[in-house]
C-alpha cells in the first residue's frame, strides 16, 4: 500500500513537490516552474507537472492551484479524473481566482508569493 509520495515514486522528489503545493493558499496559484524552483529544481517545471499528474487522489493535494507560466490551465491527462481541465478552472473560480476572456489568470494578482516554503 502506498502511504506517501516518496513510497509511490521511489524517491523524495514527488513528496517535496507535494509538500510545497500543499502550502498554496485558497485563491492563489503558482506556476509549474515556480514549484520546481521552490523544491530546489529550477528549470524542471515538467517534473512538477509529472508529479501533479500522478497525484493519488487520497493525498488531497490542491493540484488545481498550479498552472502554466502563461497563466493558463495546462491540458492534462489524469488517470482518475476525466474533464480535469474544466474541473481545475471550476475549482480555482470557486476560490475566487478570476480568468480573463482568453482563459488566463492575472499572475500579478493571483500568484502565490511565499516568503519561505519552510515556514
Predicted feature locations:
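Nucleic acid-binding interface residues in structured DNA/RNA-binding domains
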Residues: 2-119
